[in-house]
A protein has these predicted regions:
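Enzymes that bind and transform nitrogen-containing heteroaromatic metabolites
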Residues: 1-295
Length: 295
């Protein structure tokens, strides 16, 4: 039987298939726990992330096809990972759940440019549950919305982007001195401020971590793209990965550079980042894998 995107199951609970046992000594500081009933109906069980004491914890949320494509090539897509996930409702719910838990959402400029109307809040991807997410954040003593950090070395951003103009959503653009000069010429909204942290053409991962720490952020969510994810992996700053595996094969050829899960970073022999599988969930034909990286 042929399976098409239109025939995929949507809105199903993220059924738990396997959970790793709790470590003998559970971390003292954690974020999350039992979910509100409206969220638990879609994600049975608890959602807990261990927090570092000495630095912000960073978790990543990414999507990949069966053959490892995380995003289509520039010009092929205007929705980021939407075409890869098949616009899965379950994937959008997982995105909302992690945003609801986070102090900060970090996105790379490339991811910003392909989603002009996107706003990095739980309510944007799950509007029917907006009040539930707001109440959940209030119960955890979190700000009404996570602060969004856009990483752009060049400062080449569209000031009319919906995510840069959403009421009540603070945005910081982490950039270089050259990028800051360009941004100073743009009509950015009052909720956007610029942090000059990079040098040359690069925003170092360590400097980005300092921006998160200065905000008082304990938990940051990286939503890519693959270049930013690779930078954070290379700096050994990614603590967990929530990976949606979409049940499609996209393919690659010489006509366009479709992005893998990690771009711009390669690890030498014996230097790759290994992770331990901590949970497996499914919704329809989608798999939701959670990995914890070793220290």
């Amino acid at each position: 039987m042929e399976v098409t995107m239109a025939g995929r199951s949507e809105g199903l609970p993220l059924e738990s298939l396997w959970e790793a046992p709790e470590p003998p000594t559970a971390p003292v500081d954690r974020r999350g726990g039992p979910l509100p009933p409206a969220l638990a109906a879609r994600y049975p069980g608890e959602l807990i992330v261990a927090l570092h004491e000495e630095r912000p914890t960073i978790v990543a949320n990414m999507v990949s096809s069966l053959d490892g494509v995380a995003a289509l090539a520039p010009g092929e897509s205007n929705t980021g990972g939407g075409e890869i996930s098949g616009f899965s409702e379950a994937d959008r719910f997982m995105m909302a759940l992690l945003r609801g838990l986070a102090d900060v959402v970090v996105v790379g400029a490339g991811a910003v440019r392909v989603g002009h109307r996107h706003v990095w809040t739980a309510a944007h991807v799950q509007p029917a549950l907006a009040d539930t997410f707001a109440a959940w954040r209030a119960e955890m003593w979190l700000a009404p919305q996570p602060t969004v950090i856009v990483v752009s070395a060049s400062g080449n951003l569209d000031p009319t982007h919906a995510g840069l103009n959403a009421p009540g959503v603070p945005v910081i653009v982490a950039t270089t001195p050259t990028g800051a000069e360009r941004l100073a010429q743009l009509p950015l909204g009052p909720n956007v401020r610029v942090a000059t942290v990079g040098t040359g053409k690069h925003v170092p991962a360590g400097a980005l971590l300092e921006v998160i720490h200065a905000l008082g952020g304990r938990l940051a969510l990286c939503e890519g793209g693959p270049h930013l994810f690779g930078e954070l992996l290379r700096a050994r700053l990614v603590d967990e990965l929530f990976l949606t595996v979409a049940p499609q094969v996209v393919g690659r050829d010489d006509t366009a550079h479709r992005l893998g899960l990690v771009e711009g970073t390669s690890f030498g022999e014996g230097q790759g980042r290994w992770a331990g599988l901590s949970s497996v969930r499914r919704a329809g034909d989608d798999l939701f894998l959670r990995y914890r990286f070793a220290e």
